[in-house]
Amino acid sequence: MSPIKPPTMVRSRSQLGSAYAPHHPFTFEGGEGACMTVPWSGNRDAALKEITKRTIAEQIQEYCEAWAARATQGTGLRHPVDLTQAVDQSMISGGAVRVRYGDLVFQTPEIVGYVPFPLAFVCKRCGLHRSCDSLKTAEKEFANFHAACPNDRQGCANDWQQIDVVMAHWSGDLEPLTPSYRHWHASQGGPPGAGEIRTISTCMSCSGDRFYLKRPPGSFAGWHFECVSCHTVRPILQRDRRTLELLGPLLQAGQTTQAFPAEINMEPISYRASAAHYTHGDQLLVFDEDRWLGLLAESRIQELCGFLATQYGYPTTQLSDAERERILREQGRHQEWVNYKGSRDVLRMVENTPGATQQMLDGLRGTLQQAEKDWNETVFAGRQQAAPGILEACTARSRWIRRYDFVRMAAEHKTLEEEKLHGGREIGDGKKVSVDVRVLDPFLKPDGLSPADEARMLEQVSRRLDLLGIAEMRLVRNVGVCEYTFGYTRTESKPTVQRDKLQGAEMPVKLRLHGRVKVRDGAAHPVLCIEQSNEGFYVRLDEAIVLEWLTRNGVAVPAAGPDVALGGRLIEDFADAQNDNASRFSRFLDEYRRDRSVPRRAAAYVFTLLHTAAHHLITVASAMSGLDLSSFGEHLFVPDLAFLVYRRGTTMDLGNLSSMWRERGHPSFGNDVLDRMVNPSSLRCGSESVCNQRGGACPDCLLIPESACLTRNELLSRSVLIGRGLPRWDDVRTSIIGYFEIAAERALANAP
């Protein structure tokens, strides 16, 4: 018999990538008809650039590898954790996690299949439990349910309700509620651990095979089955088949390695509960070119060192003209040297010419400086005297977590700078790709302002930016973002789960990929991708204020020459921190979830500062734009002291952020957004004392939905902005001075 082809449904792309992702239980409108989504082969390939696909595949590999490493630690368990308990078998090769690029297919979610699930029912009149073995036989079995009626088969109400409670396990399995349960039967006289799985489907007292499902009000703990014949009670109990196969032999007492029954037992949960399905995915900025991101390849470490050295002001090796000419000729760029020499000769002549204008001199000097800068970043890369910390960072970064990689952030910022921030590019209708909020374009100015009022408004904007310690703030249009989902877990969204019966032991949560779909001549796991192009705000903090803030709070920064920017020193500090188990940035930031356990380091503190400032802007923008908190995303560029906050969404960008900025402008206070951010009350918390004790970040103030946050709400603290406390992980235990406090001191000191 050919397999049943499931029906399909259409939902929005964002819903199909999350709430209706493959293997997600759902009910139709009105709560009737419980079903489960299944992978569908009819979705079209996502129109992504090859570099974007490769980056997504690398992120998935990194995510799964880190997940497995954390899940297999087995803290508090009495046996080693098998890798198959942490990730899908399809990800495992040679005893390691390997997500092959060829096993993935990148698709745009447009349609999804679904099947009825669970196939377990209860009589609305008497509570008799019935179930179907499979979809193929469900119709026939359902028609015979009334034959099992314990009262009057002829007068049976034949009115059945689908049970909306399922049995779930952190292995990723979901099963219908059933009176049958599995157990491990040890072989008598066989070798240690020998045995098999057996199922008990009948009453232990009378061997009856019909049961009532009793559902008293209250928690699921009160639910139970009752034998129709003898009324013997049977608890709701099931053991996960996959885990029982693996750990069943370890259930016997007296063994050196032993499993707990609680590791194997499934749990009853509501079909609609979030614990039934946690979708896993990520997002990344989409760029047009990979000139700078291409330097991140392992084969280009020397060029990457040269880029960082040039970008952050490390001194260059002095090359003679003959050496520079030779290198450029070898690279096929000799004509550039000829042009450079010609411009240099002209400059020398003009400098000795009476009446030469400063504008002419500056133009010639700028041409020479630009040529030298370009050469230092490309053909002369690797000849800079980069500090050992920079070389270590470029060499060791292959072991770092991608989203916390300061070197990658530097390359991404350089790309963003060239493609979006500077250069005066337009997107059509005269709109520029990015606009400095100190110098607004016609599309961001409030209507009806006189030139005098406009000048006053921009003056007030500048004043508030100074009070916030912001050196540059821009509205950026057409921020390219790709969001994707690739897998799921049950019962818990993190790599481990704890239960009271195990007294703190951490059990592994299995990360599963979306089920395979047909692709040409084979099958592959779908990665559901959604590309977006929306507005955002780019913010860069003042380097001098950040440096003073670190110094006054006793946070050491690696020593460097006077011309070396703070960003280079932060990269060095981050590289050093990655070698310290107490302060490294692991995938799930376990180090920073422990109270008072991490020393003060510049990398962690600046990351927390930028992250907190980004959340502060998100909460204010959400309140003033009408967008909910989950409609925002964030990206940090720590070495450049910058962050990007943008609108997430697959619907057409209606210019919510630009409209908000335009409508909130006023000559008296510049702009409501900045005025609100400056106002101390915007960072007060309704749970002030409790929040401060927990590090200064809670749902009442800074936390946003985890799906929108870069770190799932770690490395946040109001104290980095306003003082009056310190982050929960800081082991110094003395309150810090807030960044806004120092910025305000400087702004007031410089006020006319």
Question: Residues of each region from the PLM?
Answer:
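N-terminal alpha-helical interaction blocks
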Residues: M1-A147, R153-Q161, V165-V166, D173-Y181, ...
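Charged, low-complexity interaction segments
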Residues: M1-Q61, H185, G189-R198, M204-T608, ...
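Residue-level signal for mature regions of secreted extracellular proteins and peptides
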Residues: P116-L119, F142, Q162, E196-T199, ...
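Subunit-assembly interface segments of extracellular/virion macromolecular structures
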Residues: F121, V166-A168, L174-P176, W184, ...
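Short cysteine-rich clusters marking metal-coordination/redox-active sites
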Residues: C123-C126, H146-R153, A168-H169, C203-C206, ...
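Short, non-ligating residues that shape and space the ligands of small metal-coordination modules
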Residues: C132-D133, P176-L177, Y212-L213, V233-L237, ...
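Short cysteine/histidine-rich zinc-coordinating motifs and their immediately flanking basic loops
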Residues: L135-F145, M167, S180-W184, P216-A221, ...
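Elongated scaffolding segments in large macromolecular assemblies
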Residues: S187, G649, S658-P752
